[in-house]
Amino acid sequence: MGTVMTVLGPVPASELGAVTMHEHLHLDQYAEAEGTTPPERVALLRDCAIPALRRLHDHGCHTLVDATPMPMRAEPWVYAMLAREANLHIVLATGFYREAWERESWEYAGCPTYPHRWMDPRVAAWDVEALADLLVQECEQGIRGSDVRAGIIKLASTRTAFTPLEEKAFRAGALAQRRTGLCITTHVEPGLEPLASPVAQLDLLEAAGADPSRVILGHVQPHLVRLPGEVRQCLDRGASLCITNLQAEGNDSYWRAVVDAIRRLFDAGFGDRLTLGLDWAFDNVTGPFVSCSWMPLPPYVYLFTHVLPRWKEFGLTDEEVTQILVRNPARLLPRV
């Protein structure tokens, strides 16, 4: 099975248990560079995140993938502290976010002010090879001079058409994936109309040399229902999916349609390519740094206490849940 790089070092994939594959422990929407994590944020994470993370073990979940890119992350030591105190495996990302290149995308997120961009300024200043070197350094040597190493590469885009800086970041991520053997996990924008294309991301990554079997296309929950042809095309080419932003309350007909789409993918032989995450975050999207503004409580464990019980009522089986949460992450997260 191989080993997975966590913030406390390598862990055998057989020890991961269930894995929630796309979360955020510290998401600073206004950061322009990575600096010191304010002590009040660390206190919030100690008081609110750690109890929720400990509860994950009650459901057989021993691993969380933090998909937060530069410069939105906390200091590396914060993740190591959370992992130790929650006794949880945390896989931390390296990588770059998308550009807030149109006011609509910023206002959709509920942010009170409109910045120039979300993307790390080094993407504009450095060439593709230097950016790839930075990603590889964080994976193989450590993040910001620490011994905390990244275990996955995060990339993001806003629309089907990439901005020049988004394309540059994707090319750097593809180079880093080839050099490290780690998976790429992406942000396919799920909230703006028309829906962004996961195929466009896969096209660019493949053209830049990435292995499609090491690509996880993220936030594709609405695509399962509305763009099933695009989803199937990505799966046919070897990619995996991360289905996120999951809720248990309200709109039963829609969530039943999501579960039906997942079960059809199992029937078509693609059950080994599916993963789940909430996209839960402690963040400052509305100004102050607080609990997630777009997902219900409780943090992280909501997937197990609310979503999966409801989805099982809609027909998802225990065997399918085990495949999605245990076997698939154990295959995807080790470097190859």
Residue map of PLM features:
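Mid-to-C-terminal alpha-helical segments outside catalytic/metal-binding sites
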Residues: G2-G9, P298-V336
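Active-site gating/metal-coordination segments in enzymes
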Residues: M81-E85, H89-V91, G95-C183, S240, ...
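Alpha-helical scaffold segments that flank or form the walls of functional sites
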Residues: G17-M21, H26, E34-H89, E129-V148
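Short acidic/histidine-rich active-site segments
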Residues: T185-V188, T244, F270-S293
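Histidine/acidic-residue-rich catalytic or RNA/ligand-binding cores of hydrolases
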Residues: Q29-A33, P76, E102-E104, P194-D203, ...
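Active-site gating loops and adjacent loop-to-helix segments of metal-dependent hydrolytic enzymes
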Residues: E23-D47, R55, R98-E129, R149, ...
